[in-house]
């Protein structure tokens, strides 16, 4: 029978220039706490599934990281290509896949700017907080569109700002303002999802938020004495009817 993983895979090596540092292996406990706290009601995933369904389809997971989202995707998708360039993340990703028993996931050690898959090879591409940070990510956008079949979907999740936590990354929130027009120019719709970071204890909230954003975050948690914090993301979605290079 036709094997999607071997039919699409070209085996090109990853370029070091595409690697964003991955801190999960050095801070495993904090990384785990953050993953548990983020979007506990799964509102983000539900919105992604509604915009770009993956049930029975071939999915490209751009920036798979340690596989926290890859494994749930594999429960629905026909096959998942887990694209991850960071060497530190790859052992965790492979271990997570092995322990889950998922047989329909192919790890692709590469970045978004040079995806070693054939043209028109996947039905859907997801990217959650990876690579697509507005201006400058055009090369990766062209590559992802190349591997998505006509009629397929691309869904990109990024911070929206204008929420309780964005006060701690002022420069990033300013950068977020440039993203909606950048994506809109390239044919993307945008859906805002209101969700939360919900920790089990104040100590967990202190540990994670202080690690991420320092003393201002620590003071905020202590002053407000709670474990849940408002958070908004933007999901940029586009149906791939024609490639970006053909439109511009």
Label each PLM-derived region with a short phrase.
Residues 184, 189-248:
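Conserved Class I S-adenosyl-L-methionine
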Residues 138-150:
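A short glycine-rich, Lys/Arg-flanked "PGG" loop and its adjoining helix->strand segment in the class I
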Residues 60, 65-114:
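Class I SAM-dependent methyltransferase SAM/SAH-binding core
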């Amino acid at each position: 029978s036709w094997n999607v993983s071997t039919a699409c895979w070209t085996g090109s090596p990853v370029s070091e220039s595409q690697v964003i540092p991955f801190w999960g292996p050095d801070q495993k406990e904090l990384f785990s706490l953050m993953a548990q706290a983020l979007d506990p009601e799964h509102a983000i995933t539900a919105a992604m599934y509604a915009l770009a369904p993956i049930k029975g389809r071939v999915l490209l997971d751009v920036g798979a990281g340690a596989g926290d989202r890859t494994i749930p995707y594999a429960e629905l998708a026909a096959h998942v290509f887990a694209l991850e360039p960071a060497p530190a993340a790859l052992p965790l990703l492979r271990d997570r896949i092995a322990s889950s028993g998922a047989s329909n996931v192919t790890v692709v050690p590469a970045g978004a700017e040079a995806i070693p898959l054939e043209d028109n090879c996947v039905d859907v591409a997801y990217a959650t907080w990876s690579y697509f940070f507005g201006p400058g990510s055009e090369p990766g956008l062209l590559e992802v569109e190349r591997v998505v079949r006509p009629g397929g979907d691309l869904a990109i999740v990024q911070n929206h700002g204008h929420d309780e936590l964005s006060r701690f990354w002022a420069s990033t929130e300013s950068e977020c303002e440039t993203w909606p027009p950048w994506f809109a120019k390239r044919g993307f719709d945008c859906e805002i999802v209101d969700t939360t970071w919900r920790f089990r204890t104040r100590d967990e909230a202190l540990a994670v938020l202080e690690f991420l954003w320092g003393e201002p975050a620590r003071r905020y948690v202590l002053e407000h004495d709670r474990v849940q914090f408002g958070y908004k993301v933007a999901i940029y979605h586009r149906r791939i009817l024609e490639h970006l290079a053909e439109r511009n």
